Amino acid sequence: MEIIYLRDEFIKLGQALKAAGFVESGVEAKEVVQEAKVLVNGEVDTRRGRKLYEGDVVSFENQTIEIKKL
């Protein structure tokens, strides 16, 4: 499980996927999100710009990101 620590109030889904190293680019993030391959808190979300807050959990290809505050 990867942990991303927030410096601000939120991080966008596409940015979180890139920060965790799950995708290499914003274009790739957009594709996997639009193809419904990403779960946020156990539900499919196709919005690359979805705001993630402390406590949110993102899953992609058997990998997980947990969002925490610094």
Model feature map: region roles:
Residues 2, 57-70:
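A positively charged, amphipathic N-terminal helix/segment that binds anionic biomolecules
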Residues 9-54:
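A basic, amphipathic helix-loop patch mediating RNA/tRNA/ribosome contacts
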Residues 1-11:
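A detector for short, charged/polar N-terminal pre-domain segments
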